[in-house]
UniProtKB/Swiss-Prot annotation:
Gene Ontology MF terms: 2 iron, 2 sulfur cluster binding; 4 iron, 4 sulfur cluster binding; iron ion binding
Binding residues annotated for iron-sulfur cluster, in chain numbering: C45, C109, C111
PROSITE patterns for the chain: HESB (PS01152)
Protein's name in the database: Iron-sulfur cluster insertion protein ErpA
Alphabetical keyword list: Iron, Iron-sulfur, Metal-binding
Subunit composition and interactions: Homodimer.
Family statement drawn from the similarity comment of this UniProt entry: Belongs to the HesB/IscA family.
Gene3D superfamilies the UniProt entry points to: HesB-like domain
Role of this protein: Required for insertion of 4Fe-4S clusters for at least IspG.
Pfam families in the cross-refs: Fe-S_biosyn
GO cellular component: cytosol
Length: 117
Protein backbone atom coordinates (compact mmCIF):
# COMPACT_ATOMS: atom_id res chain seq x y z
CA UNK A 1 0.00 0.00 0.00
CA UNK A 2 1.44 3.37 -0.99
CA UNK A 3 1.57 6.41 1.25
CA UNK A 4 -1.33 8.86 0.96
CA UNK A 5 -0.71 11.84 -1.26
CA UNK A 6 -1.81 15.36 -0.48
CA UNK A 7 -3.42 17.35 -3.26
CA UNK A 8 -2.43 21.01 -3.18
CA UNK A 9 -4.39 22.99 -5.77
CA UNK A 10 -2.57 25.45 -7.98
CA UNK A 11 -3.69 28.77 -6.57
CA UNK A 12 -3.88 30.78 -9.78
CA UNK A 13 -4.43 30.07 -13.44
CA UNK A 14 -2.56 32.49 -15.71
CA UNK A 15 -3.91 33.22 -19.20
CA UNK A 16 -1.81 33.41 -22.35
CA UNK A 17 -2.36 37.20 -22.48
CA UNK A 18 -1.05 37.61 -18.93
CA UNK A 19 1.95 35.36 -19.61
CA UNK A 20 2.84 37.31 -22.75
CA UNK A 21 2.65 40.64 -20.90
CA UNK A 22 4.74 39.37 -17.97
CA UNK A 23 7.36 38.06 -20.41
CA UNK A 24 7.46 41.42 -22.21
CA UNK A 25 7.82 43.35 -18.94
CA UNK A 26 10.60 41.07 -17.72
CA UNK A 27 12.43 41.52 -21.04
CA UNK A 28 12.05 45.32 -20.72
CA UNK A 29 13.62 45.17 -17.25
CA UNK A 30 16.45 42.96 -18.53
CA UNK A 31 16.31 40.76 -15.44
CA UNK A 32 15.35 37.13 -16.13
CA UNK A 33 15.20 36.41 -12.37
CA UNK A 34 12.03 38.48 -11.93
CA UNK A 35 8.85 36.70 -10.89
CA UNK A 36 5.32 38.10 -10.84
CA UNK A 37 4.01 38.19 -7.27
CA UNK A 38 0.21 38.17 -6.97
CA UNK A 39 -1.12 39.02 -3.52
CA UNK A 40 -4.15 40.11 -1.54
CA UNK A 41 -4.09 43.05 0.88
CA UNK A 42 -6.69 44.75 3.01
CA UNK A 43 -8.23 47.81 1.44
CA UNK A 44 -10.66 49.14 -1.08
CA UNK A 45 -14.36 49.62 -0.50
CA UNK A 46 -15.07 45.87 -0.26
CA UNK A 47 -12.34 44.90 2.22
CA UNK A 48 -9.65 43.22 0.09
CA UNK A 49 -7.75 44.20 -3.02
CA UNK A 50 -5.33 42.50 -5.39
CA UNK A 51 -1.73 43.51 -5.80
CA UNK A 52 0.89 42.74 -8.42
CA UNK A 53 4.64 43.27 -8.10
CA UNK A 54 7.84 41.95 -9.58
CA UNK A 55 10.12 40.18 -7.13
CA UNK A 56 13.46 38.43 -7.47
CA UNK A 57 13.11 36.39 -4.29
CA UNK A 58 10.71 33.68 -3.21
CA UNK A 59 9.90 32.88 0.39
CA UNK A 60 10.06 29.26 1.47
CA UNK A 61 6.27 29.11 1.87
CA UNK A 62 5.41 30.86 -1.42
CA UNK A 63 3.36 28.86 -3.91
CA UNK A 64 5.10 28.90 -7.30
CA UNK A 65 3.41 28.51 -10.66
CA UNK A 66 5.85 28.05 -13.54
CA UNK A 67 4.62 28.14 -17.10
CA UNK A 68 6.27 29.01 -20.41
CA UNK A 69 9.34 30.46 -18.71
CA UNK A 70 7.33 32.72 -16.38
CA UNK A 71 7.13 32.23 -12.61
CA UNK A 72 4.15 33.54 -10.67
CA UNK A 73 4.37 33.44 -6.87
CA UNK A 74 1.64 33.68 -4.23
CA UNK A 75 2.45 34.19 -0.55
CA UNK A 76 0.99 31.89 2.10
CA UNK A 77 -1.39 34.55 3.48
CA UNK A 78 -2.88 35.28 0.04
CA UNK A 79 -3.06 31.64 -1.06
CA UNK A 80 -6.48 30.75 0.42
CA UNK A 81 -8.05 33.84 -1.15
CA UNK A 82 -6.68 33.07 -4.62
CA UNK A 83 -7.25 29.31 -5.00
CA UNK A 84 -9.12 28.84 -8.27
CA UNK A 85 -8.61 32.43 -9.45
CA UNK A 86 -7.51 33.38 -12.95
CA UNK A 87 -5.11 36.21 -13.76
CA UNK A 88 -5.59 37.82 -17.15
CA UNK A 89 -4.25 40.90 -18.91
CA UNK A 90 -6.76 43.16 -20.64
CA UNK A 91 -6.26 46.07 -23.00
CA UNK A 92 -9.12 48.40 -23.85
CA UNK A 93 -10.28 51.97 -24.23
CA UNK A 94 -9.89 52.58 -20.48
CA UNK A 95 -6.28 51.36 -20.52
CA UNK A 96 -4.54 48.10 -19.84
CA UNK A 97 -4.26 46.13 -16.62
CA UNK A 98 -3.95 42.76 -14.99
CA UNK A 99 -7.32 41.51 -13.75
CA UNK A 100 -8.30 38.67 -11.43
CA UNK A 101 -11.42 36.54 -11.90
CA UNK A 102 -11.87 35.05 -8.44
CA UNK A 103 -14.59 32.46 -7.73
CA UNK A 104 -14.03 32.99 -3.99
CA UNK A 105 -15.14 36.64 -4.10
CA UNK A 106 -18.73 37.00 -2.92
CA UNK A 107 -18.94 40.69 -3.86
CA UNK A 108 -16.82 43.17 -5.76
CA UNK A 109 -16.94 46.94 -5.74
CA UNK A 110 -18.27 48.94 -8.67
CA UNK A 111 -14.83 49.69 -10.06
CA UNK A 112 -13.77 46.03 -9.73
CA UNK A 113 -10.58 46.73 -7.81
CA UNK A 114 -11.65 45.29 -4.46
CA UNK A 115 -13.64 42.30 -3.25
CA UNK A 116 -15.00 40.54 -0.18
CA UNK A 117 -15.21 36.88 0.77
Amino acid sequence: MSAPQTFVPEPVQVTENALAKVKALIEEEGNPDLKLRVFVTGGGCSGFQYGFAFDEACAEDDAKIERDGVTVVVDAMSYPYLVGAQVDYEEGLKGSKFVVANPNASTTCGCGSSFSI
